């Protein structure tokens, strides 16, 4: 038996290395299982549901058969050394030497080599999300009916504990790069407001359920991928509620060529307030107001306002030429990033974050909204988007709709935040924030007529600011 544990260690290493090498098969098995469950929970038409279930079941059976073959191959590897041990046979696996050998071989297989040849991506950067994290995100966010079922279960439990929806909340919106993230971070940090955060992903529709499973301590903050100096950690607030609207929408509003205006019906609005309730149930400060940064919010604002006269919305805007330049720079940055790490685009698509990058799509507020005709590397393209966005914002119901300019917010952050929280009825003793004075240098030609129109709209919004 002297050499048997050595051979068993090597055989176990080979068996578990085979398992590791076939990790994509295990991922496929997990995703196929979720697809079957998602199909069973679907409320689609019976024929569509059966067709989806048939496809998911076929994929699951195929993955199961391959997995069984993998188990047999691995078991054969481990069993082979046992056949040559006189008097013990498979009893070797029950001895301490056998258990230690299998454990050592299995551990080594997941450590050496560090990267398998098929996992290497020449010229590609390592993703911030591990393969296991990516799998978990796909299991949840690609299967909306499972996600909805978990949300409804959590809402029922919240109501059973006496939870009631509150129609007063705050939306922070505007085109990307207008200062919305900075404002959201400061509002949440005050304790008077609560928002969804990165720690809620991927089970973002059932934050209480996910927190019971995964409740990490605050992580050290690092600069976000935008490269704009804003530091984020797993407890940083972020625009995550779009998963709710994509899941609950009666018709898809992310289309091939644009993200289009859409209507929120009464049932969706009621469910949205319930969803805010379960999000607030996880807030560290009781009595906090729900706040969401959502750059898509204006696309559904008219119907939300018809259902609800109590909520407040902030529209942040910025000098049009510097705003267009900032959007163009971020678009170019994210195109390169997403080519290097495709999961970045997948993640942004889940959040309907189409403002820039390879998945960039313009907002379309009405059928007659003109889509940009200039290339995405021109300032004119982004200026067209700016005009469409803020022209629509200025035409919307003024009730509790607050316009805040980026330049004023940067120059007088404390005064702006004080005025806003007074408007929405929150009591906050704000610290004295340092003004932000950095100016962007703009390079590139622009259509003078477009710029003149944009600056006219900018002046109108400046006039709508309070204070």
Regions found by a protein language model. Name each.
Residues 1-17, 87-98:
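Long, highly hydrophobic alpha-helical transmembrane signal-anchor segments
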Residues 181-194:
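A conserved segment at the C-terminal end of the G1
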Residues 47-74:
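Loop-to-transmembrane boundary segments
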Residues 121-164, 335-467:
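PAPS-dependent sulfotransferases, especially Golgi type II membrane carbohydrate sulfotransferases
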Residues 78-120:
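Alpha-helical transmembrane segments and their immediate juxtamembrane interface regions
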Residues 293-295, 304-329:
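Conserved phosphate-donor/acceptor-positioning beta-strand/loop module used by diverse small-molecule
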Residues 20-47:
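Membrane-interface amphipathic/juxtamembrane segments adjacent to transmembrane helices
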Residues 199-291, 360-362:
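PAPS-dependent sulfation machinery
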């Amino acid at each position: 038996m002297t050499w048997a544990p050595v051979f068993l260690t090597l055989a176990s290493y080979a068996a578990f290395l085979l398992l590791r090498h076939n990790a994509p098969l295990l991922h496929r098995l997990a995703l196929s299982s979720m697809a079957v469950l998602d199909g069973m929970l679907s409320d689609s038409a019976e024929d569509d549901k059966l067709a989806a279930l048939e496809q998911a079941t076929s994929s699951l059976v195929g993955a199961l058969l391959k997995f069984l073959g993998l188990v047999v191959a691995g078991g054969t590897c481990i069993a082979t050394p046992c056949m040559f041990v006189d008097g013990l046979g498979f009893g070797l696996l029950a001895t301490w030497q056998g258990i230690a050998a299998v454990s050592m071989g299995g551990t080594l297989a997941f450590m050496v080599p560090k990267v398998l040849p098929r996992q290497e991506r020449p010229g590609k950067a390592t993703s911030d999300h591990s393969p296991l994290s990516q799998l978990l995100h796909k299991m949840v966010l690609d299967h909306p009916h499972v996600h909805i079922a978990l949300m409804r279960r959590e809402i029922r439990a919240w109501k059973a504990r006496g939870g009631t929806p509150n129609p007063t909340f705050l939306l922070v919106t505007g085109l990307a790069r207008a200062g919305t993230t900075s404002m959201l971070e400061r509002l949440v940090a005050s304790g008077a407001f609560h928002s969804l955060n990165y720690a809620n992903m991927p089970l973002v529709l059932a934050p209480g359920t996910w927190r019971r499973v995964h409740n990490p301590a605050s992580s050290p903050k690092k600069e976000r991928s935008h490269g704009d100096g804003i530091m984020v950690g797993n407890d940083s607030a972020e625009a995550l509620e779009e998963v709710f609207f994509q899941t609950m929408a009666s018709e898809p509003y992310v289309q091939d060529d644009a993200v289009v205006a859409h209507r929120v019906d009464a049932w969706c609005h009621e469910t949205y307030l319930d969803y805010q309730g379960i999000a607030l149930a996880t807030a560290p400060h009781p009595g906090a107001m729900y706040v969401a940064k959502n750059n898509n919010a204006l696309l559904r604002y008219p119907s939300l306002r018809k259902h609800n006269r109590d909520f407040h919305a902030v529209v942040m805007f910025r000098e049009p030429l510097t705003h267009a330049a900032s959007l163009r720079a971020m678009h170019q940055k994210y195109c390169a990033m997403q080519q290097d790490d495709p999961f970045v685009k997948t993640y942004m698509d889940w959040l309907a974050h189409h403002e820039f990058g390879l998945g960039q799509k313009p907002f379309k507020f009405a059928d007659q909204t003109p889509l940009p005709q200039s290339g995405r590397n021109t300032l004119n393209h982004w200026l067209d988007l700016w005009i469409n966005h803020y022209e629509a914002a200025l035409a919307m119901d003024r009730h509790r709709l607050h316009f805040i300019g980026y330049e004023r917010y940067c120059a007088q952050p404390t005064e702006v935040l004080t005025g806003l929280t007074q408007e929405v009825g929150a009591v906050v003793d704000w610290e004295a924030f340092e003004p932000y004075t950095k100016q962007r240098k703009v390079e590139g030609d622009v259509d003078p007529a477009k710029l003149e129109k944009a600056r006219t709209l900018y002046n109108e919004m400046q006039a709508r600011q309070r204070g």
